[in-house]
Amino acid sequence: RVLCDGRNYSDDHVALLRVQANDTHPRVRLDALRACSWVNTAAAAEVALEVVKHERDYYIDYALEEAIRGMEPLWKSAISSGKPFAANNPAGVEYILGSIPTADLANLPKSTPVLLAMLTRPAVKAQARQDALVGLAEFKKTDEMTELLSAIDYVDKTDAPGAATVIYDLVLMLTRREPGELAESRARFEAWTKSAKRAITRRIGYVALIAADESVDPAWKLATRSLDSLK
């Protein structure tokens, strides 16, 4: 509260608020959020997002939503400029991108968080999803298959509305990969059959195993060991 009231008299108030936004006590983090909304700069929006790294309650969620809404022109301008924003806070970037409509998201400068959001959101056109996959592999200097499998893992673990539909879309992309890529990813498919969160992902794991092995026998043998994995 002192930092908030004295924000016009301190040159390092944002840095000090960053410390408070990461405090172990939720009340301190809540007061830091309130102060950020009064500072009203892109840097303050970055600090407000620091609370996403920690456990949140109703009051922190409410304060965060209000603070981010009030500073929307500032953080949108920062993101649209292509300059680094909350670069060391992927959870915070994910939170803030969640408030941007898909149509607007497609117009933002390409970055790993933006491309991941395009790849894993519902109601994204097939070509836009494919373009996001290609871009993500380029940004991360990996390959499309690696990023596609990681995206399926990511969506499987979320509780976001439409996640099952997204998994279907991603699996459709998986069916277009080369047989050799499927064979090389066999261990990942088997892991899905055993430990995926969603039943649909576990079942897809079996289908992918059959495609990778070009035979139903190994998948059938694995399935009969545990009927629970088929549920």
Language-model features: where?
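Long, ordered, helix-rich scaffold segments
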Residues: 1-231
